[in-house]
Amino acid sequence: MKKIFLLSIALLLTSLLKAQYPGGGGGGAPGGKMPSIGHLYGKVLDAKTKESVEFASVALLWFDKDSAVAGCLVKTNGDFSLDNLSFGAFRLRISFIGYKTIEQKIFMNMQNIDKDLGNIMLAPDEELLKEVVVTEDKATVQMSIDRKVYNVDKDISARGGTGLDAVKNIPSVTVDADGNVSLRNNSVAIYVDGKPTTLTLQQIPSDQIDRVEIITNPSVKFDASTTGGILNVILKRNSKPGYNGVIMGGIGTNDRYNGMASLNIKQGKFNVFGMYNYNTQTNYNDGFTNRINATLPPSSTYTGTINKFYNQTDTNRMKNTFQFARAGFDYYINNRSTLTISGNYVHGSFNSNDFQHYVNNDYYGNFASGGDRVNSTRTSFQNYTGQINYQHTYPKQGKEFTTSLTLNGGQMNTTYTYTTYQEKPALPQILQTSNGSKPSWMYTYQADFVNPINDYTKFETGVRSFMQKSYTTQQTFNKDSVGDMVAYTDLTNNYTITNLTNAAYVNYSSRVLGINYQAGLRFEESYYKGEITNKNISFSYMYPDAKLNKLQYCFFPAVYFSKKLPHNQEIQVNFSRKINRPNFFQLMPFVFASDNANIQIGNPQLAPEFLNLGELNYNITWGKINFLTSFYVRYTQNPITNIAYPLVSNPNVLVNTYQNGKSSMVEGLDNTLKVTPIKGLDLMANANIFYTNVSYLSGTQTITNSGYSWTGKASISYKFPGNFTLQLNGNYQAPQILPQGTTRVVEYADVTISKSIKQKLTFTLLLSDICNTKRNGTHYDTPLYVQDLSRRRESRYLRFSVMYMFGKMDSGIFKKMKQQKKEGGDDQSGMGGGF
């Protein structure tokens, strides 16, 4: 063995000493200074016995000459690894006594600095090995069989903002005044790094988002409850050797401030990352509610005056503060196994003061009653997330096993104060306070295995377990005639929510007659229970139950087909079945919130709604033009709809509740066009045109509402000389169909200008809602009442931010620091000014 080892050393030295490094670059390209951060690794095996070839020599040579760049000996287990490699074209030469020397072409660039060469077989007979090519730059829009990926790095309007700013310009995505996000006019599930999260987009800094995956029809890998699709937010991760970081600060009108710092260090087997972000802003909001009640016959349960007109105006001031911290590390156990441990911490507050003025007029327009109401809200929250991920890849390209455990916890505390001043009839001041506390936790465990059988065939399987538990206490007090605060039991609630889902899936994809297909089946076992513990009220469901009933609520298939056509064309067809289970507030037959004219109550008779989703996608690229169109259909059985009607005991009050409709159908055409006519100019336009038909039962009568609607987006971005960038974004949402009415038109435009200096320092100025036109609202038209509601959150503001990026790609940075310290620390040139 000793002789073999010495011969191997001699063979390796022979390869390395054939020529010196050109230009003294020490691993860089000849005459250049490319970053030396590449990494190649693999395993050398005997082609016949499949045993490791210990002490085989591995040498990396320049592509067009025999100058050696790097080399090593194969370890006992067959592994080899070459680090600190520059970018370019190379030849990998592997040789050993008694085996045929083989060479393999290697191409490396910035887009993939780590490359697993798999199992390389040494045999007496010469074998031809395939070239290894590192992937090209990512396109702005990427389309695969089950998702589309939008890289948001170039959206300069999102800098210094939140996750809402990062997604509001994405085609087919809309954001309302309350921060609710919709995809093709449906509520969408928010994932972070492929996992469900308790975070909202408003709590995630936009500068920490690398890209957003838009999954309009999720495959069986994901929850069957993702009926509106998924926005999978991928946070930034940097695995380049050395260190890099970002420092950012911003200021805006109306007390808008933000700051962020992040740092990433990779050395040897560890990649450590951390960041902190602070964001605060003040918003001024206003709105109104105008209602006209129909003429009703006398009621035996209500003998007072039934008012004809109700008008309410609102003005609101809200201050939001967020702090977001993230830290973690990757540990590269070996060439194919990685362990990642990370954690997030979020802390913040919402404080608002809302002033309402309301007036009731009778059928003759005379003033009947009115007054003022002041609502004060103080909310603080914290959220923490811990995650452990393990990934193991195999020599076979694409084969991998991943498993993860995610723990989320949080606490929210809220104090509401309602003060009512009644003008007519004159009444004493009414004071009501409510204190709420909501601790919650959630865990998700997931394991996935992917096994490619050949270039076109792949088998996937996985399991997932999800559990969520929350405990809410809400105590309400009214001020009595002598000034004491007395408990108000009607609005005092202590409730607990338990949500459990266990799932397993199988997925098979292959190719036949040039058509790629994917077929999968998901099974979900679900349990849900909500309890109002202080009133002994509860509701629960379990699918399937103990007797295995309702199995139809548990199986969810999905199929996908795609075909690449000549001239850069691709066509896709997909179908899936989903379920939307009613939640606690939709089920509980109890008043949860109220004001002078509205109350909300659940319906314990609600059943799940089932959705059948289908899409036909077509994508084509002509040079600098890319066009993507999608025809989609959503058919819903037993849709859960929100309806409202006058309270029988007091028709002046509107009851808001839920019920299952008969069915609903949405058909739409979603079109996105991206054009780069000249260098530096990027144009994007999106139009989503859809038809909605929804029907529900009102007593014994079937009520139907239907019609067309559309949303549109457009953006223009141009890079001027001097590293200036100008971006203009416009959004339009036409009135959309509701069960009892329509929404209000929403329209606004933003403009952003950015200046970059040496790709290190960037200044950005944003003017949001240039014309101050953004407003949300609804119009309801029923046989019992007609109501218009409008709300406007302050959306026109200026925001200025400065971002500084620093770093050095150097895998031996700490070794150099240690060496410099030994030498007295006089030479700092290799550190770019210090670290």
Regions found by a protein language model. Name each.
Residues W62-S67, A89-K105:
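A short, solvent-exposed loop/turn motif at the edges and junctions
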Residues G23-G32, L45, S57-L61, S95-I97, ...:
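Short, acidic, small-residue-rich periplasmic hinge/interaction motif at the N-terminus
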Residues T433-S434, M442-Q446, Y488-N493, I601-N603, ...:
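Outer membrane beta-barrel strand-and-loop segments of large Gram-negative receptors
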